[in-house]
């Protein structure tokens, strides 16, 4: 598969992060002295377009991306209804539909990628069971 994009949703409030995301978009929370969104972006080749869905404190993320990743093709999509009734990941992906008319890799900004991401060769979906009792 030669042409694909990467979708990084970062529209929500990040409430699971508590005070870390109160005044900051969750994508900008620092991990090893670098915003977590940079860790995600840097796992993909520079020629791959990145689509970032933004809501809560989205302007901060846009400013950061322009400064830190000016050498990348990054499309920011503003999600108006990022919290409250009708909001959610499904709506966020739907709002990005216009920019994702090709295969894409879905990569949440709160997922730490430790290995290089292989170029997708087929369509696939991955999942993992999560113990919610922690």
Task: Mark where each language-model region is.
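Conserved N-terminal catalytic core of the sugar/cofactor nucleotidyltransferase
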Residues: 1-8, 16, 30, 34-106
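Conserved SAM/SAH-binding loop
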Residues: 13
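Conserved catalytic-core motifs of eukaryotic protein kinase domains, centered on the activation segment
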Residues: 19-22
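Short hydrophobic-aromatic micro-motifs
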Residues: 105-107, 125-126
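The conserved acidic donor/metal-binding loop of glycosyltransferases
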Residues: 109-112
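Conserved core of the sugar-phosphate nucleotidyltransferase
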Residues: 114-134
